């Protein structure tokens, strides 16, 4: 850990919920940081890639995040640990890392938008080709 940074609001997850939370909070003037381990915002729901056409709302949210002066988006960044608050009344400190460094991220507020996960429920024949459930 070689440094510490501070923001007013830290959002973990840049999927639809994380992007919406940041855009809803942005008019307050807070310094907002969003972290996500994916290389592009959108989460599991709004994935980016070859042959994928993003829904208009996904493109609007991405564009708005990129343009907003008090939103900092850190893609390719993972939460690797949790520490105590930096000051009384603060949220817990998150320990973050990207490809080049690790640091402590202090914030007054923390929103966890850690996203959707597929839930596999095994049933007879569930591994056969063409079967989904």
Regions found by a protein language model. Name each.
Residues 2-7, 62-133:
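FAD-binding core/adjacent interface of flavoenzyme oxidoreductases
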Residues 2, 7-64:
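Beta1-alpha1 glycine-rich phosphate/pyrophosphate-binding loop at the start
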């Amino acid at each position: 850990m070689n440094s510490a940074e501070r923001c007013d609001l830290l959002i973990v997850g840049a999927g639809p919920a994380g992007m919406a939370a940041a855009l809803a909070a942005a008019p307050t003037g807070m310094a907002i940081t969003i972290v996500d381990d994916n290389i592009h915002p959108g989460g599991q729901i709004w994935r980016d890639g070859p042959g994928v056409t993003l829904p208009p709302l996904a493109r609007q949210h991405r564009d708005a995040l990129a343009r907003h002066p008090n939103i900092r988006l850190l893609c390719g960044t993972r939460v690797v640990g949790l520490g105590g608050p930096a000051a009384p009344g603060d949220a817990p400190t998150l320990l973050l890392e990207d490809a080049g460094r690790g640091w402590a991220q202090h914030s007054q507020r923390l929103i966890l938008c850690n996203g959707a996960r597929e839930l596999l429920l095994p049933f007879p024949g569930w591994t056969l080709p063409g079967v989904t459930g």
